[in-house]
Amino acid sequence: KLNPSKGYDIYRDAIIRILNEFKEWKAFSIGDEKRNKPIIDHQNHYELGYLTHKEVLKLLNRSEIAVVPSRWEEPFGRTALESSSRGCATIISNRGGLPETTDNCIILKKLNSNELYKEIKKLKKKKKYRNKVQNDGFNNIKHLTKENSLIIDAIRESLINKFKLNFIKNKLRIVNIYNL
């Protein structure tokens, strides 16, 4: 959704400055919000509207930087997770579940357009830094959900065998699992 609760106005103000400064760069926005949407009026900005998940992933594969400056407490930052897993240098706010999705993104110290502008500009100007953020995000262990699920399953099976749990007679009532 492209609205102020998702920080779209923060993105708008920062990206207009970036596009004015770096004429060769292009910026894209994905989403279909109809109400209260800030307008980005720039020749190098493209509003793509609604895209399927597959189309979003294709665009992320071709992108260098992704921005998720949400104001509201995101329950889970899927956009940040997917952006980072596709090799984007990902900039996020410190809201809700966003910081938990990757250990290798840039977290805005202050949630405003000037701070976002500075972080995007730093990524643009410092290629080695940008490449490091991209590579570290791409290689983040949190993206390995299939592999992590196999590890958790193996631990569960070993506990069942170790404690000779019988699910018919002695059902587990409560299970609390933390990330290892």
Descriptions of predicted regions:
Residues 95-107:
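Short acidic/histidine- and often glycine-rich active-site loop of Leloir-type glycosyltransferases
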Residues 57, 80-85, 99-100:
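Short alpha-helical segment that forms part of, or immediately flanks, the ligand-binding pocket
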Residues 3-17:
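A conserved mid-protein helix/loop that constitutes part of the nucleotide-sugar donor-binding site
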Residues 127-173:
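A charged, aromatic-enriched C-terminal amphipathic alpha-helix characteristic of glycosyltransferases
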Residues 106-114, 122-127:
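Conserved acidic donor-binding segment of nucleotide-sugar-dependent glycosyltransferases
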